Amino acid sequence: MNKKWLNIPALIALLAAIAFGSVAPAEAAPATSVSNKQNFSTDVIYQIVTDRFVDGNTANNPAGSAYDATCSTNLKLYCGGDWQGIMNKINDGYFTGMGITALWISQPVENIYSVINYSGVNNTAYHGYWARDFKKTNPAFGSMTDFANLISAAHSRNIKVVIDFAPNHTSPAMETNASFGENGKLYDNGTLLGGYTGDTNGYFHHNGGTDFSTLKNGIYKNLYDLADLNHNNSTIDTYFKNAIRLWLDMGIDGIRVDAVKHMPFGWQKNWMSSIYSYKPVFTFGEWFLGTNETDANNTYFANESGMSLLDFRFSQKVRQVFRDGSDTMYGLDSMLSSTAADYYSVNDQVTFLDNHDMDRFQVSGANGRKLEQALALTLTSRGVPAIYYGTEQYMTGNGDPNNRAKMSSFSTSTTAYNVISKLAPLRKSNPAIAYGTTQQRWINNDVYIYERKFGNNVAVVAINKNLTSSYSIAGLNTSLPSGTYTDVLANSLSGNSITVGSSGAVNTFTLQAGGEASGLTRRRQRLR
């Protein structure tokens, strides 16, 4: 479906005359991936729904009605993906070829084995969010030995491993029906702590389901029918501090925390302090925001909790501008300015186009150039970029579970794969991309030209989202040194070059329809 885009002109014209420097400023964090667990600014994350990626070991596939070998009849069942399958793709170079330096995988803990029927459809815990024991593995993904092997394989390729972790809840439960599912039972390395019904120890909240009307309502009531854990209970508090230490000891490099909006802020800050005092790793949380939504509590959490957040403000705006066409580049510029003002560490927020809870960015039958441009923006913007599995293969799918379909292909020749592979390494080679500030340099409804700057390191990116009209760009002033900037993606796409004068002024040039151009500089070394 993507081959027709391989010969399109001027999709990404990445212009580089690398000038004046080869060493990052002293304040820049080390770029080596697995040696720096606390800062992911130089990394590109690849999010994997483990069950939907590769079945590397058929022996651990669930038995009976929980498993669909075709992964097509019912996407709510297990499909067979596991850690061995991820290792296979690590070892064959699929990730390193794309420039990926971190893998975010599904929650690895033991989940319930029950098949739960909702409205006539069987549901399983393939996604990893229906936990029963946070100190054991999900056998459908592999054993502790398999997990250790995954960490080892990733680290041998200088790839970090981030685990999803969902301490907000266990599994579906009903207050009046202990036989529903597995009654939300929580185990401690095989020993039952308690279930939702008959909860005499107060391990869970029993306030009904949240209607999302207030923050407090969402914290102390169940998220849908998921048994909501009481983190103010000392046993639960100790349990999760010990549970995450087990995974830290296994060698993980990062944590994505599910549903942070639905847990007490004070407990999360204390939990993060426990993590940082034990083995600090980069941690980011999920706080969903809808289109054009802002929330002072979201901002406060990002600034005060000790963890970063998935940047839904970035994602929703990029989707509006590039995917849906419902906003202009002025809206994009406004979002970048407001988030830079709101988030103290805006470069540490995790940016993305889509994930397992959203419609995929690529729309069936839509022009793939929109996706490719949005990827280029995400990879060169502030924040830590995360790519959802299959994006590079133009996978489509609206809503759960269609947005979690089986990985469709592992082609390394798609335009999207090559865009990622060319732009991802820039986060290590140019500190402006990893650590820089962002300044708008030229704008209209369709064109956005922005500059990233860190010390004397500069990157200038120009994007024309109009797929049918070119624009003459005049009066553009930058911090780029003088020189001619040529297309480093010439092997993939046909780009143009630009000429910069001594004052940083760019000679008038034409930005092609659907085009993007980036100029990069570093100090002391010149490449012509």
From Swiss-Prot:
Which amino acid positions bind Ca(2+), per UniProt? N168, D228, H262
Task: Provide a GO biological process annotation.
Answer: carbohydrate metabolic process
Keywords linked to the UniProt accession: Calcium, Carbohydrate metabolism, Glycosidase, Hydrolase, Metal-binding, Signal
Task: Kindly identify the residues recorded as the active site.
Answer: D258, E286
The record's cofactor note says:
Binds 1 Ca(2+) ion per subunit.
Q: Name one Pfam family in it.
A: Alpha-amylase_C
| Entry EC no(s) | 3.2.1.1
One function term, GO molecular function aspect = alpha-amylase activity
Give the transmembrane ranges.
none
Paired cysteines (S-S):
none
Name the InterPro entries on file.
A-amylase-like, A-amylase/branching_C, A-amylase_C, Alpha_amylase, Glyco_hydro_13_cat_dom, Glyco_hydro_b, Glycoside_hydrolase_SF
Give start-end of the signal peptide.
1-28
Q: Which reaction does it catalyse?
A: Endohydrolysis of (1->4)-alpha-D-glucosidic linkages in polysaccharides containing three or more (1->4)-alpha-linked D-glucose units
Record site: Transition state stabilizer: D357
Q: Which cofactor does it need?
A: Ca(2+)
- The domain of life for this entry's organism is Bacteria
Q: Tell me, how does this one assemble?
A: Monomer.
PANTHER family membership: ALPHA-AMYLASE 1, ALPHA-AMYLASE FAMILY MEMBER
Protein name, as recorded = Alpha-amylase
Organism of origin is Niallia circulans
